[in-house]
């Protein structure tokens, strides 16, 4: 589900930031965005929206960034693009990861680019009331291979055999020579695996 995608994204971020930190999120969003931050033991920092695209008030957002800010979790509400050149510059200049919630905005664009292909990671929902449905379903997209590998494993109980990066998988095997390589778990995780039947419905 989109909720599972949110939770998995935040769980994977805990492997990048084991010390924790803050996630900036808008108050106008779905509850699973906020819950996913809390479940991962990050601290949500709420920044109010503007009235034009229901995204962050960027002046308030800049004033809310601290040295503990790990990501900006933006929600594209009701098909509206929440991005701007200024927001992307803030993320780039401060080296803060941008997470996109695209659950309500499949197909929307920013500067001729599809939403969900711009941030560090993006979450989609295939709930029956959304643009594309698998009845229930979700997806994470990212261009970062390490983050992708984390998501692959953490969506399947944390099993390192799910890793397609051979070097990353071998590292776990080398660290645990006394364990069966097919049953090494990287830590607490979930079973968020989808199935082919749902995928067919989406097609």
Language-model-derived ranges and their functions:
Residues 35-37, 90:
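Hydrophobic/aromatic ligand-binding patch that stacks against planar heteroaromatic rings
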Residues 3, 28-34:
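Conserved coil-to-alpha-helix start sites within the AMP-binding
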Residues 5, 23-25, 126, 138:
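Hydrophobic alpha-helical segments that mediate membrane insertion or helix-helix packing
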Residues 52-149:
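Active-site phosphate-binding strand-loop segment of PLP-dependent enzymes
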Residues 1-22, 38, 46-48:
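Phosphate-binding glycine-rich loop
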Residues 105-111, 118-203:
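Active-site region of PLP-dependent enzymes
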Residues 41:
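Structured binding elements
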């Amino acid at each position: 589900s989109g909720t599972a995608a949110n939770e998995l994204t935040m769980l994977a971020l805990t492997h990048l930031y084991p010390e924790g930190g803050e996630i900036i999120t808008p108050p106008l969003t779905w509850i699973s965005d906020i819950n996913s931050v809390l479940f991962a033991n990050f601290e949500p920092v709420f920044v109010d929206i503007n009235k034009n695209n229901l995204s962050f008030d960027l002046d308030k957002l800049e004033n809310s960034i601290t040295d503990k800010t790990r990501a900006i979790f933006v929600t594209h509400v009701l098909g509206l693009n929440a991005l701007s050149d200024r927001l992307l510059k803030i993320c780039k200049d401060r080296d803060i990861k941008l997470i996109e919630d695209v659950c309500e905005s499949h197909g929307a664009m920013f500067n001729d680019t599809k939403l969900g292909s711009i941030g560090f990671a993006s979450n989609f929902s295939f709930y029956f009331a959304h643009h594309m449905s698998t009845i229930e379903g979700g997806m994470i997209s990212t261009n970062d291979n390490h983050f992708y590998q984390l998501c692959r494993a953490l969506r399947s109980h944390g099993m390192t055999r799910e890793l397609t990066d051979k070097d990353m998988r071998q590292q776990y095997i080398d660290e645990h020579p006394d364990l069966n390589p097919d049953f090494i778990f990287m830590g607490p995780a979930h079973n968020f695996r989808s199935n082919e039947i749902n995928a067919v419905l989406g097609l």
